[in-house]
Amino acid sequence: AFVSKNPSKSLIFKRISFSQNNEKFMPPTGTPFSYHEIQLVQWWIQEGANYAGSLNEFSVTPEIQTLLLKQYGLDTREKPWVEKVNLDPLPPSAVIALEKANFSMRTLSQNNPLLDLRYQGEKLSKQALTLMETYAPYITWLNLSNCKLTNSDLKTIAKLENLTRLNLQQNSIRTNDLAPLNTLSHLEVLNLHSTLVNQDVFEILKSIPSLKKVFLWNTKVSLNAVLKNKPAFPSTELIIAL
């Protein structure tokens, strides 16, 4: 009835695609397949025609993704990391401790305990670093702008396994200081505005393939350097002031 991965040689696909006037048209009676249903059959055969397979096992093209969502309410888009993490709510004692250590915070939503955390002190304290490490799984957005960060501080930040956004602007950090961040496999946004990073930063950024956006204005990185390196970052937006 079908040839795996070859719709054009599959009898079932041929017959549902025939004109209704053709004596071999399927189904011979009842409602014919819609255009969208024919598309799905074609895609299913191309993917190997596995009866027992789930959608997660198939390569869903953007066209099929849109069709499944609009026609059947099936959302096959990959969920962002923050929606995949499953944690119990942060205990009140932790919230109090973080606030006493000069952090302001909010959860991403009522049902998502991951934290958007901002340090409001002049210099990141040892107490703050200890608390960040203690509650590392909860921290996904972190703003450490203008708080006199050191190389050692960045080694602690590299332990925040669920970090997706990191703001390091207005700190005297250099390119090599960022090397530990290659452990942050879910980091999507990195703000390096007004830091001391130079054009060597692109080698560091290559080691963080999850990045989608990097802010580089008011650094030692030139526009020419950004344009030269942009082909190496097809999925990353490199932002620099003109």
Question: Where are the model-predicted features located?
Answer:
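The leucine-rich repeat
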Residues: 26, 128, 149-153, 173-177, ...
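LRR N-terminal entry segment and analogous cap-like coil->beta motifs
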Residues: 77-172
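Hydrophobic anchor residues at the C-terminal helix/turn of individual leucine-rich repeat
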Residues: 132-133, 157, 178-181, 205, ...
